[in-house]
């Protein structure tokens, strides 16, 4: 597992930090561990899909943010955090790694600090109260 993570990290750095992945590949990866019938997929750029209210689910139980940049993370929070149910989990994949993601989260919550659980050097987890 460690070696695979190291290879992935090396690959990411080599590719300027970002990879593209088809929706089909995402579904194939998820189907190994989850029933994808209960997962809402929305293909497209964050700026396009999340600013269109018809694309948004009414309630979210698990919200995973993994877009790295300030603007996309800000849009995710603005449009999705209010839909996260009480007791729901938000995972911020790149809080400790990408400055844009961290700044967007810090700006969004401002003085109203949530408790972010430290998962590892990059990931933080929040349980909505």
Question: Where on the chain are the PLM-derived regions?
Answer:
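S-adenosylmethionine/decaboxylated-SAM
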Residues: 1-129
């Amino acid at each position: 597992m460690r070696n695979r993570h190291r290879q992935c990290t090396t690959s990411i750095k080599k590719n300027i930090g970002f990879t593209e992945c088809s929706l089909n590949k995402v579904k194939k990866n998820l189907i190994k561990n989850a029933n994808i019938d209960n997962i809402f997929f929305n293909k497209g750029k964050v700026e396009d899909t999340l600013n269109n209210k018809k694309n948004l689910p009414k309630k979210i139980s698990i919200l995973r943010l993994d877009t790295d940049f300030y603007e996309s993370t800000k849009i995710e929070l603005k449009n999705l955090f209010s839909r996260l149910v009480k007791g729901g989990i938000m995972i911020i994949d790149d809080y400790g790694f990408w400055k844009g993601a961290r700044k967007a989260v810090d700006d969004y919550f401002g003085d109203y600090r949530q408790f972010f659980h430290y998962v590892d050097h990059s990931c933080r987890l929040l349980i909505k109260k």
